[in-house]
């Protein structure tokens, strides 16, 4: 096991929620780190007394802004009695990058406090933990979803109109599950960020500006970007700031949103149902952020031009059928919310690096086209 270097703790995480297992007195590993059986067994023993991992094999490693390891573990009798499976997925930030955001501690809290209260399908979590020193270090140990026999989504998969409609029914189930619920108020869940009220949201363009600049050097990206954006790339920053102000001023019921709602953050079960699997940007928010991001990103440009409004109406019907109340009318969603939230997708994908795991060029084409078709820039003062 490689030990991470020790460094002074920077206060990244302002929600100093006490760690769930106070018996763990050492910090979670960070920086470049490779777990082994001894480390995993010691960690899991905080929740499952007597558990030991006799051996552990790393089956697959995904390393981007988040580190995900599929592992095969041989547990002792205590582990088997606790129901721990052989195949697991460990997720944390051991990439050596992105240490200035709170996404890993937040995801751990989502799994510890909230996902079992959602009506939508989520991955089984066997362990979730975080440091409460402001460092935002977090770790989760999930089931290996490969064992469910489905497949992981990818941002460029062609789901088609029917596939997107099916996914929107699943998304409505997610949003309606804790719609306007007392469980997600600031008083009941002070650890839960409100959409567009935290730096990872409202400063996202500025945080990601380095990668936005890298894409601006790419001739393939420049070939599909609007000239007005290439002439003044800071337009995305100004427009996005106005989206932030618009959302903060809007008054409507809150729900739980995924926050980064594209096909690449889903797992498709054998029965076709979508499972929402990445909670690093989970929020108390309104559904239009998820809805716009998913539909514009999942549909081809021509599919969107012909079917977008009908799919939005379908989602709204599903949302109400699942129990949501005081839902704004379709015209307001279509004319006021969707065009503005396209800017969220534009700023997200202009900063995407393909080596993080999602192919950004088709997404940039789709969101840029939607921005022009729906007058998103104009609505946001650009």
What are these regions (language model features)?
Residues 128-132, 181-196, 326-333:
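Short, glycine/acidic-rich hinge or "gate" loops at secondary-structure transitions
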Residues 149-258, 366, 371-382:
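ATP-dependent phospho-/nucleotidyl transfer catalytic cores
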Residues 140-148:
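Short pocket-lining segment of the protein kinase catalytic domain that shapes the ATP-binding cleft
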Residues 109, 281, 287-324, 340-363, ...:
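Active-site activation/catalytic loop segments of kinase-like enzymes and analogous catalytic loops
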Residues 149, 153-158, 246-249, 261-262, ...:
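Flavin-dependent oxidoreductase catalytic core characteristic
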Residues 93-96, 152-157, 277, 293-301:
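Glycine- and acidic
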Residues 1-137, 245, 269-274:
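Conserved NTP-binding catalytic cores of kinases and kinase-like/nucleotidyltransferase enzymes
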Residues 62-80, 238-287:
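Active-site acidic catalytic loop and adjacent metal/ATP-binding pocket
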